[in-house]
């Protein structure tokens, strides 16, 4: 090992800091022997995650030694305010050190100094040898070490601090952190600062004067009470700063690049068995692997004794709880509301959790004898700084809803670090993602259901009418479970770099964009829709009369029974399919097949199409307009389709028709306000381009690289004709083949779609694969890989589970094989449009433009653009979307402009 290799990394963990935090933040677990193990489990989980995230060539876990340090000699009151260590915590120190060593982490404990000093010395050695150092800690003192070669990471808050991060968080450069802390004081270490000087004042002074020495020199110029307080502490400040400076020259028994060790699997197995860590034992493999479900350890502790939750009944209680939350690295957060409609719901209460504690803040409960509550206005005045602070990390379950609710009260939630719904969606997309299911699955914890608290059906009461004591049990448990589920789920995501990327770089930032889009809403011309509804009604009456004439009698066109009688008993049409009860089917597939040869089924289909347009769109959409905004505000679900595709609900804006003239007219009602235009930016043939990238097929890549019409190019290959001689019918067939094969279409399906013989369809498919052998090879390899792994992945690492891929049932297995081919393309397309949304939103935000993102529909982004921003937006949106990822074929975006959505698309 060359100590001068600039690519090498030293990974250091502040073991004492994490031990304390894990003890106070995680459930109180006990081993089968009755030993406390909660902190041990938390630290070991963190170490395993760090090892996976940072491929370090040397690493160590550093602990404080027993006894006084040189700082105690200089200042006897140093850390004198700390209570004695709880016995359950003290009992875990030596077993933890033993476990760290077994895990392959050298352990360092040096008498007379603190862990911070040892870490600083090792980082200094590594810096001098050109190594990079990553320090995992929650201690702000170590920010003084940060430079271009030293980075801090905080696994509990998911925060990374480089020099820019230190400046952003503290307002000063790393080399001024000790000056900053000398002014603010360090309450944890009992080092006093200047009375009434907080982080903002300290940062302002250092920015203004340059250093602590300069602040001292200009003390006489600073007026007010803080100036007086500063002048009273001038003699103390140099000493306070000395106490806060970490030593970088501690005498150590080992060099930094000698801190290497391999895990001792036998020792680990013995320790995991002793501690009862069944999940970690299972990760080692062997007989114990199936001993218990993944989250058995916290489950038993959580279920055995329902937590005692706190009700924040008055302002004093809230202030005390807020002071504690401000010191927490991560807080579970949830809201209770008047309803579930995001744009109109208002607060009834809020719940918070950290460690093993949780509390409920009732705000607007109304029932006979309900006690006085703080009230929404006063509570938000107190909580707003914490709620909006980006440095105060929060975790929630479906936080987008809570962010809407707070926005309804004028609060912009900051510090959104994690969302357990998204964690579950990324890690286990095929599972249920609601909190009750997550708690049961990962904690073994059966939660109180909403129905248990509010009742069901006609007897259901509003949450505001729920008695506060009962509301506390339910609401605080939600925040508590959210926090606990995150502690189990996130380490699993963080341990796999590709999943971590999908979660952190796609899903979390996409949530913020979707929130913005939902709140922007879409302007709807309701008068136009009402006129269309009237016209559709007239057309339906016309089709109804034509159907009566074709049937030879009046009948109810909405009655399957009467349609059966007319079609199959009176007109003797062939029965194509039967219902489960043995009756002739009149579903859409049957009518479409019959419509090829008979007039009445065709009329019935046309009538049904008109009826659906009227009932689903022209009649219903105007009722969805928010009276306060005059706009339609849909709700985008990120955790809907396992491929990552977004779903739109209440109303669904992603299935607005486009294939028929009447359907397209509905899009005319989606309009821009006066002075603005609708801009549509749509990825062209995105899934085929992804297939070209994934398969590496030279024919497909060549067609896309040279801007050819890919369907015409495919037709030329399949039918063996020159590109300029391809007929319209040949191109149509090639288009069906291109898209059909992506969806795993068989020869039978292709024959049905094209209305040709199955043998002819098979010839087309064989010809296609003989010309595009890369596609065939990719499909075969993907199926084989899916059978082996049980899943497939998108280009960006989204995992798509295929539980039926090895099923003994041929139909289920073949369906899974089709999914294995299609899912990576659909999933990659979903990832791309999310990345595009993020890029466009970031640009709009950065440039402070008035342009609004208003819709995402499959591969299309829709914007509302003021006319004076139109040209810039068209160019920039196309550029951003086309360059959001570098595939092996170019991404092409078609941009259209109009007064309404139909004109723009």
Where would I find each of the regions flagged by the language model?
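C-terminal structured "cap/appendage" subdomains that terminate the fold
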Residues: 232, 257-261, 840-894
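A short, charged helix-loop
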Residues: 159-188, 440-470, 479, 483, ...
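Conserved catalytic core of nucleic-acid polymerases
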Residues: 461-464, 512, 516-519, 574, ...
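Extended two-metal-dependent nuclease catalytic cores across DNA- and RNA-processing enzymes
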Residues: 2-6, 29-30, 80-253, 440-442
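C-terminal polymerase-core module
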Residues: 538, 542-545, 549-602, 770-818, ...
């Amino acid at each position: 090992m060359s100590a001068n290799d600039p690519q090498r990394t030293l990974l250091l963990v502040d073991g004492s800091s994490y031990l304390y935090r894990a003890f106070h933040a995680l459930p109180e677990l006990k081993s089968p022997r009755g030993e406390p193990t909660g902190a041990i489990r938390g630290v070991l989980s963190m170490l395993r995650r760090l090892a996976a995230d940072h491929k370090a060539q040397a690493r160590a876990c550093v602990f404080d030694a027993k006894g006084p340090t040189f700082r105690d000699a200089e200042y006897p009151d140093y850390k004198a305010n700390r209570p004695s260590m709880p016995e359950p915590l003290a009992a875990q120190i030596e077993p933890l050190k033993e476990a760290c060593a077994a895990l392959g982490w050298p352990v360092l404990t040096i008498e007379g100094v603190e862990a911070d000093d040892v870490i600083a010395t090792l980082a200094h050695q590594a810096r001098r040898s050109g190594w990079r150092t990553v320090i995992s800690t929650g201690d702000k003192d170590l920010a003084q070490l940060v430079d271009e070669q030293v980075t801090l990471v905080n696994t509990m808050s998911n925060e990374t601090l480089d020099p820019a991060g230190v400046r952003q968080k503290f307002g000063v450069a790393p080399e001024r952190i000790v000056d900053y802390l000398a002014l603010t004081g360090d309450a944890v270490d009992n080092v006093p600062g200047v009375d009434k000087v907080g982080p903002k004042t300290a940062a302002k002074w250092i920015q203004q004067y340059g250093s602590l020495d300069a602040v001292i020199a200009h003390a006489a110029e600073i007026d007010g009470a803080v100036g007086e307080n500063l002048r009273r502490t001038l003699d103390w400040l140099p000493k306070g700063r000395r106490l806060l400076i970490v030593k970088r020259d501690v005498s150590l028994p080992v060099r930094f690049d000698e801190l290497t060790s391999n895990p001792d699997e036998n020792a680990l197995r013995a320790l995991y068995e002793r501690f009862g860590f069944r999940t970690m034992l299972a990760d080692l493999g062997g007989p114990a692997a199936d001993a218990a479900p993944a989250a058995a350890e916290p489950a038993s502790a959580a279920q055995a004794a329902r937590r005692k939750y706190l009700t924040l009944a008055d302002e004093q209680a809230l202030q005390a709880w807020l002071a504690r939350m401000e010191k927490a690295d991560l807080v579970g957060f949830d809201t209770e509301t008047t309803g579930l409609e995001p744009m109109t719901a208002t607060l009834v209460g809020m719940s918070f959790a950290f460690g093993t504690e949780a509390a409920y803040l009732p705000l607007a409960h109304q029932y006979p004898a309900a006690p006085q509550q703080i009230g929404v206005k006063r509570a938000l005045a107190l909580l707003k700084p914490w709620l909006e602070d980006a440095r105060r990390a929060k975790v929630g379950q479906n936080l987008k809803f809570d962010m809407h609710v707070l926005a309804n009260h004028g609060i912009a939630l900051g510090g959104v670090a994690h969302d357990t719904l998204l964690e579950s969606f990324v890690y286990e997309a095929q599972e249920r993602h609601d909190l009750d299911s997550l708690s049961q699955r990962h904690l073994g914890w059966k939660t109180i259901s909403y129905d248990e608290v509010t009742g069901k059906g006609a007897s259901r009461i509003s949450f505001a009418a729920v008695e506060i004591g009962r509301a506390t049990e339910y609401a605080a448990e939600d925040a508590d479970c959210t926090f606990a589920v995150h502690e189990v789920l996130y380490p699993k995501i963080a341990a796999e770099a590709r999943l971590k990327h999908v979660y952190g770089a796609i899903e979390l930032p996409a949530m913020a964009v979707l929130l913005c889009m939902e709140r922007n809403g879409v302007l709807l011309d309701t008068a136009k829709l009402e006129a269309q509804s009237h016209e559709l009604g007239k057309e339906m009456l016309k089709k109804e009369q034509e159907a009566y004439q074709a049937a030879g009698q009046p009948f109810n066109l909405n009655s399957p029974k009467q349609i059966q009688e007319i079609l199959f008993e009176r007109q003797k049409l062939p029965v194509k399919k039967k219902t489960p009860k043995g009756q002739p089917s009149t579903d859409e597939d049957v009518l479409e097949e019959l419509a090829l040869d008979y007039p009445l089924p065709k009329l019935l289909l046309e009538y049904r199409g008109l009826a659906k347009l009227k009932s689903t769109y022209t009649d219903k959409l105007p009722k969805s307009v928010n009276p306060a905004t005059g706009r339609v505000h849909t709700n985008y679900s990120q955790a809907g389709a396992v491929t990552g595709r977004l779903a739109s609900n209440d109303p669904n804006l992603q299935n607005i028709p486009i294939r028929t003239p009447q359907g397209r007219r509905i899009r005319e009602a989606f309009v821009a306000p006066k002075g603005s235009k609708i801009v549509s930016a749509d990825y062209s043939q995105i899934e085929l381009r992804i297939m070209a990238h994934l398969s590496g097929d030279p024919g497909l890549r060549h067609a896309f690289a040279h801007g050819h019409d890919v369907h015409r190019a495919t037709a030329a290959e399949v039918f063996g004709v020159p590109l300029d001689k391809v007929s319209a019918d040949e191109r149509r067939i090639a288009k069906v083949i291109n898209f059909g094969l992506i969806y795993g279409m068989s020869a039978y399906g292709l024959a049905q779609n094209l209305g040709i013989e199955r043998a002819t369809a098979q010839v087309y498919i064989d010809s296609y694969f003989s010309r595009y052998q890369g596609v065939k090879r990719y499909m075969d390899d993907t199926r084989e890989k899916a059978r082996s792994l049980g899943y497939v992945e998108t280009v960006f690492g989204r995992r798509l589970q295929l539980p039926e891929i090895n099923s003994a049932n041929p139909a289920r297995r073949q369906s899974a094989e089709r999914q294995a081919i299609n899912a990576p393309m659909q999933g990659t397309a979903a990832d791309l449009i999310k990345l595009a949304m993020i890029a466009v939103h970031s640009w709009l935000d950065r440039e402070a433009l008035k342009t609004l993102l208003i819709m995402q529909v499959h591969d299309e982004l829709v914007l509302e653009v003021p006319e004076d921003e139109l040209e810039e937006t068209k160019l920039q949106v196309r550029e951003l979307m086309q360059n959001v990822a570098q595939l092996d074929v170019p991404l092409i975006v078609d941009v259209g402009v109009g007064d309404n959505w139909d004109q723009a698309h």
